[in-house]
Amino acid sequence: MMNGAKAIVKKYNEVSLILRIVVGLVIGAVLALAVPGAGWVGELGSLFVGALKGIAPVLVFVIVASALAQGSSKLDRRFGTVIWLYMLTTFLAAAIASITSFMFPVSVVLADAAQSDVVPQGLGEVLSTLLTNFVANHVSSLMSGNYIGILFWACMFGLAMKNIGSDTTKKFLADTADAVSQVVRWIINLAPFGIMGLVYTNVAGNGLAIFTQYGKLLALLVGTMLFMALIVSPFIIFLYLRCNPYPLVFRCLKESGLTAFFTRSSAANIPVNMALCEKLGLDKEMYSVSIPLGATINMDGAAITITIMTLAAANTLGIPVTLPAAVVLSAMSALGACGASGVAGGSLLLIPMACSLFGISNDVAMQMVGVGFIIGVIQDSVETALNSAGDVEFAATAEYHQWLKQGKPLPDFLK
């Protein structure tokens, strides 16, 4: 009996998560149409969202605190350009996502009737909420899912630990972060069952029309990412190198983005990016640091996902979002995106943090996370491809910009 169960689990894990989620989505829709009264199927979705709600605050705290505690302060000045490019493009990605959300507003059907806790009227109230949440009690922040407070106290704790913590203590903190990340991976591994339950609840209550709305949301996400990859990033590269940027852009998309599309992991794509940097003639001392750094802080796709999903939640609840408030959201999404690296479903799990700026409850935010998992088969692949290709593009741009300042010619493929 035990051997049979182990064989089933092994077979389940051998199938790719993408395929399992697609199967779960289809089964959920079919069951909703065939037996709409089977409430136990919908409970699987509730359990999945509940597990995410339970682990997400702890995950954000330990990941951020551990990253700051382990961080190195010995970063050479010549990396300033590449860090600036990584951060600039991540913010621009979030800002462009805000603009496209205003141009093409999208709302979605959520499983439960959703309302916001507080509807902010403008930038002043948003900033007031932000500042108040920053210094909220850290225990209550973890319990209530106040991600602004969680981030603030995690940063304080991590920086303090970096200065006074022993190596053993820092190792314990890193191991704790790894352990929590492992729990998240276990939960994500059960996503097909959760997705089946979420799709069942939505289709049983609203019919197949929900997929039209999800399609619009997915089109907005992918369209914004493509605009960033093919228009904005090349323009920034052109400003630095004063040459046609597309040979570099297309080479990075082909050799880095394509692989990342299928691995769905910037961290897993680091060896691919290292090899590409070598082909591009970059300084190994430079790219050996800038590529792993890019996999952590160059998160254009994640910033787009967080921003668009948050504004979709606001549209769904009828919350008016002013342009200045959207700028604050863009900055928060860009900063939050930098913490998405190496976390399963990282950008999706940071949606509640951004939603909290507009008084959107944790329950509603986690329903948006569930929607994100439904469309994540495509969204996450495109997001990772954009992130990973950008790592090499801007590492190369920073290096080639230095070449130009030194009077050294650009590589032949850029002339």
What is the meaning of each model-derived region?
Residues 255-337, 395, 408-415:
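Helix-loop-helix junctions within the multi-pass membrane cores of secondary transporters/permeases
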Residues 308-415:
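Transmembrane alpha-helical segments and their short flanking loops
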Residues 59, 194, 265-273, 303-309, ...:
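Transmembrane helix boundary and interhelical junction motifs in multipass membrane proteins
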Residues 74-82, 182-189, 279-295, 323-324, ...:
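Membrane-interface alpha-helices at helix entry/exit sites of multi-pass transporters
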Residues 8-34, 46-52, 77-248, 408-415:
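Signature of multi-pass transmembrane helix bundles
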Residues 40-41, 76, 208-216, 245-251, ...:
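Membrane-water interface of transmembrane alpha-helices in multipass transporters/channels
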Residues 68-77, 163-167, 206, 242-245, ...:
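Juxtamembrane helix-boundary/capping and inter-helix hinge elements in multi-pass membrane proteins
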Residues 51, 87-91, 95, 222-226, ...:
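Hydrophobic transmembrane alpha-helical segments of multi-pass transport and channel proteins
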